[in-house]
């Protein structure tokens, strides 16, 4: 069986408070976007993970797809499989590609082995794999709370008919580095309230808290956001802790940045 794990963007991201477990409480909106990997799972004599496309750091044994298989196998009698991932979504880019691969592995295994797991059951299985993994089970726009792994208001925003332009500039921003540059603050306008307003209002009100410190350290990322607005974006931002920048357009935008070995981009209808 084959599936196509998609990326996501963050529409706004508020860092609210530091948690006793060392993580942070956040509020954000996850929105699925059509930048996809390809995932195939077939029966095999022994369980193995292989990949192609973008290079995936680490060993096969540490891959999130294989980790998800192992978690499921602890609860259900799964036979061996060959998991192959063709990686197109940039890695460490604020697009949730690894989390999506894990979630789609769970969904595909659910189909392959006819486990008949509900969405809620699959969310519980993948939640330990990564904070935003559970989002990709239902895979619809939604508000995320706490560590980004509990949800409310599914379908909160619909950008159908718009276009998205994403550029990953080949800059790695470590998640810890991004959080270290943010001062948590609970005195915020709820992101859900902002998203209910017209798209034209978002530029003034919908903020990603990571941008200020990340832009100071990596001005090239800030420049990309400015270029999106110069191209006519109705809204532009950095996704998650970076470094991908996206613009939302009313019509198909013109390309202003060439792809290289380090820089990847995607233009697609939403």
From Swiss-Prot:
It comes from the Bacteria. Its EC number is 2.7.1.148. Pathway: Isoprenoid biosynthesis; isopentenyl diphosphate biosynthesis via DXP pathway; isopentenyl diphosphate from 1-deoxy-D-xylulose 5-phosphate: step 3/6. The active site is at 8, 132. One of its GO terms (biological process) is terpenoid biosynthetic process. It catalyses: 4-CDP-2-C-methyl-D-erythritol + ATP = 4-CDP-2-C-methyl-D-erythritol 2-phosphate + ADP + H(+). This is 4-diphosphocytidyl-2-C-methyl-D-erythritol kinase.
């Amino acid at each position: 069986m084959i599936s196509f794990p998609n990326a996501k963007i963050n529409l706004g991201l508020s860092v609210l408070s530091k948690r006793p477990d060392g993580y942070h409480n956040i509020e954000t909106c996850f929105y699925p976007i059509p930048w996809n990997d390809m995932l195939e799972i077939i029966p095999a004599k022994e369980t193995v993970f292989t990949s192609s496309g973008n290079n995936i750091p680490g060993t096969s044994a540490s891959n999130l797809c294989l980790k998800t298989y192992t978690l499921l196998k602890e609860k259900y009698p799964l036979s061996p499989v060959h998991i192959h991932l063709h990686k197109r979504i940039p890695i460490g880019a604020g697009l949730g590609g690894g989390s999506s691969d894990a979630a789609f592995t769970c969904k595909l295994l659910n189909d392959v082995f006819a486990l008949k797991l509900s969405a809620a059951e699959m969310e519980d299985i993948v939640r330990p794999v990564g904070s935003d993994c559970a989002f990709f089970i239902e895979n619809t726009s939604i508000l995320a709370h706490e560590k980004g792994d509990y949800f409310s208001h599914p379908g909160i925003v619909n950008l159908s008919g718009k276009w998205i332009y994403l550029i990953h500039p080949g800059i790695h921003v470590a998640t810890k580095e991004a959080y270290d540059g943010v001062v948590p603050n609970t005195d915020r306008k709820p992101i859900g309230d902002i998203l209910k307003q017209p798209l034209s209002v978002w530029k003034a009100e919908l903020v990603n808290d990571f941008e200020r410190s990340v832009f100071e350290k990596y001005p090239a990322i800030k420049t990309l956001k400015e270029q999106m607005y110069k191209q006519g974006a109705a809204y532009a931002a950095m996704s998650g802790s970076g470094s991908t920048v996206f613009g939302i357009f009313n019509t198909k935008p013109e390309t202003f940045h060439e792809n290289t070995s380090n820089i990847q981009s995607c233009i697609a209808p939403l």
